[in-house]
Amino acid sequence: MARLSEPSPYVEFDRTQWRALRMSTPLKLTEDELVRLRGLGEKIDLLEVEEVYLPLARLIHLQVAARQALFATTAQFLGEPQQNPDRPVPFIIGVAGSVAVGKSTTARVLQALLARWEHHPRVDLVTTDGFLYSNSELSRRNLMHRKGFPESYDRRGLMRFVTAIKSGADAACAPVYSHLLYDIVAGEKQIIEHPDILILEGLNVLQTGPALMVSDLFDFSVYVDARIEDIENWYISRFLSMRAGAFADPASHFHHYSTLTDEQAVFAARDIWHSINRPNLIENILPTRPRATLVLRKDSDHSINRLRLRKL
């Protein structure tokens, strides 16, 4: 564990230091399960789950228990009835980071691990993609070229959804996004019913503003970090893999990319990266990193070897 030379709200760890914090937390995830959770291009293995994600799951488990005790204390102070142990106040986790950095895999692995703890078996995962405006609405607002930027999301709808969850609503509905169609699926909803833990994953979930933001309702947050040059390479590699995979489906919005040569595909991917994803990362996503409870720092091979925990 390394304390920064200047006063700081963070404590830094290398992987060896961090893995020691696992204590006796058991690994209840199999190789087959991990394969299903792993995103395209991700290299996560069971060793990384043991050394990085199990200590993180243990930390979150401890914080869930502490948060519930705090809610009980507040209820006692207000003279309110103790909360139903079968319906605790949901613990909300935000997972942020760039396109292609691996935040979706991080969110899925966390969901799988946390759901195996006895005291919080209901762990739901929602991505903010569902709160993008539909393509027709983005076109009406002249925002198709800004898709993924903060203004392309229904931020009020997202705020209503998370507030409903946090307030103990019986159910809350999130729109569903199709990466195949590159659009919201009309009439389809993801129904979330009083979870113990909700994981909200997306590019801009840690953003702040003059009014109440969704990040203000988080109990814990993770930022998946890497060098910008590495993320660009991962994005291009993923694009090439999808050209022969998802893009080959005639129903895919990006089917026209499936016939590109390697050289053409790299050129197209790099153009998208530099015109959309890189500016969004630098202008909107990266500035939110200091707000995260925990920063996971990846090396060029996708492995997590540095962590920064916010202690305040």
Curated annotation (Swiss-Prot):
Binding locations of ATP: 97-104
Catalytic reactions on record: (R)-pantothenate + ATP = (R)-4'-phosphopantothenate + ADP + H(+)
Protein name per the record: Pantothenate kinase
Enzyme category, top tier: transferase
Location (main, coarse): cytoplasm
GO terms under biological process: coenzyme A biosynthetic process
HAMAP family linked: Pantothen_kinase_1
The keyword Cytoplasm is annotated on this UniProt entry: yes
Pathway membership, UniProt: Cofactor biosynthesis; coenzyme A biosynthesis; CoA from (R)-pantothenate: step 1/5
Keyword ATP-binding: yes
Subcellular location: Cytoplasm
MF annotations from Gene Ontology: ATP binding; pantothenate kinase activity
Family: Belongs to the prokaryotic pantothenate kinase family.
Record keywords: ATP-binding, Coenzyme A biosynthesis, Cytoplasm, Kinase, Nucleotide-binding, Transferase
Pfam families: PRK (PF00485)
Entry GO terms, CC: cytoplasm
EC number(s) reported in the record: 2.7.1.33
InterPro entries to which the protein is assigned, alphabetical: P-loop_NTPase (IPR027417), PanK (IPR004566), PRK/URK (IPR006083)
